[in-house]
């Protein structure tokens, strides 16, 4: 899945949430730490980081540096959205008890490449 397709999926999620009373704008085209920002259906400021996986993993993964950057934002609801073959999952990061970080060899960029880095 290329970055253009990922951006289309991100925009589709924003569109669907906006149909449900959210007020979001897509901002995943650049180098932002999140893919959408705006207000929840209850009018609370929020940001959403989105991941689209081709394979199902029981344990959902968010890179530690992205998590830390999201958690550093003040007075905003932080949401992690994951789409995979088994469904769509939204996690409210503000109060979620996170496990200890685990180092994994992952692609060096958003797009799947053969180059791997050890990431938290």
Model-derived segments and their meaning:
Residues 26, 47, 78-82:
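A structural signal for short, well-ordered beta-strand segments and their strand-loop junctions
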Residues 54-67:
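Active-site-adjacent loop/helix micro-motif of nuclease/hydrolase catalytic cores
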